[in-house]
Amino acid sequence: MSSRSRSTFLAIACFVLIDWVTKLAVLLYLGNLPDANPILYQYSWGKLLFCICPTFNEGAAFGLFAKYKYFLFFIRITIILGILAFLFLRKKTSSPAIRFSLILLCSGAIGNVGDIVFYRHVVDFISIGYKRWFFPTFNFADIFISLGTLIFIYKLYFPTKQKIK
């Protein structure tokens, strides 16, 4: 295995581990509470609010397409395999930013697919709000997917210019 492949594998493993360990910690803590919808942690800073409150999501982003679980699972696995094939089989080196964005996307997808395999749903637990408005609850895998998508789109629209010698 080349050093590039090894570092790619280690990066994906680290990001997936971060996602799974945080979800497991929330689930273990949740197991000790009798409340059906607990807030495990809450911090407010003025009108901004941060909460750790577990929710379970059977669909895609924000619970979309929950009725199509098997189709979504197939799509997720296909995307993961496609990204892994690109990262490990492509001989030509892509830009470091594109490579990093794909590592983040793959890590987030693996994290959420792991939830579906082990728990039959995705474990979301991070909630951010302002006044009475709350963003849908999410997890670290969602952060990795969102950040990877933003970096990928940015590099597509604003590629690094080659220096002319």
UniProtKB/Swiss-Prot annotation:
The active site is at residues 124, 142. GO terms for biological process: proteolysis. It is an enzyme of class 3 (hydrolase). GO terms for cellular component: plasma membrane. InterPro entries: Peptidase_A8. It comes from Chlamydia abortus (strain DSM 27085 / S26/3). This is Lipoprotein signal peptidase. GO terms for molecular function: aspartic-type endopeptidase activity. It comes from the Bacteria. It catalyses: Release of signal peptides from bacterial membrane prolipoproteins. Hydrolyzes -Xaa-Yaa-Zaa-|-(S,diacylglyceryl)Cys-, in which Xaa is hydrophobic (preferably Leu), and Yaa (Ala or Ser) and Zaa (Gly or Ala) have small, neutral side chains. Pathway: Protein modification; lipoprotein biosynthesis (signal peptide cleavage). Keywords: Aspartyl protease, Cell inner membrane, Cell membrane, Hydrolase, Membrane, Protease, Transmembrane, Transmembrane helix.
